[in-house]
Amino acid sequence: MLPSMSLPSLXWMLLSCLMLLSQVQGEDSPADTPSARISCPKGSMAYASYCYALFITPKTWMGADMACQKRPSGHLVSVLSGAEASFVSSLIKNNLNALSDVWIGLHDPTEGLEPNAGGWEW
């Protein structure tokens, strides 16, 4: 676990934002496999009927979330299956260096400043 003093600075080290261009479906979705038929905007990649884009822009979690929501049906990614985790992981590994951090939908709204404030949120 990171000391609470390092957590606020982590937000400024952020180099990436992941965006999901459609509503997220759960593990029981029949579309858990990659689909070659979906058409995504330029700079996005299709997986399981959804479009994913990786943005290399320094932002806080809130800033990244707002930037994603400005796009059609965009949200920070919520990883709901092992297959989706593998896809997202490979997207990050193929586009960023090993020292980069990314934001996803799960976050600590207190940025570690209040350890007993209720925990993580989507």
Curated annotation (Swiss-Prot):
Tissue: In pancreatic acinar cells.
GO cellular component, one term: extracellular region
Keyword Membrane tagged: no
Transferase recorded as keyword: no
Propeptide boundaries: 27-37
SUPFAM superfamilies, alphabetized: C-type lectin-like
Residues annotated as domain C-type lectin: 38-122
Disulfide topology: 40-51
Superkingdom of source: Eukaryota
Protein's cellular compartments: Secreted
UniProt KW keywords: Disulfide bond, Lectin, Secreted, Signal
Signal peptide stretch: 1-26
Single annotated GO MF: carbohydrate binding
Subunit structure: Cleaved to give an A chain and a B chain joined by a disulfide bond.
Matches recorded under PANTHER family: MANNOSE, PHOSPHOLIPASE, LECTIN RECEPTOR RELATED
Record function comment: Might act as an inhibitor of spontaneous calcium carbonate precipitation.
Record's protein name: Lithostathine
Species of origin: Sus scrofa (Pig)
Name of the gene: PTP
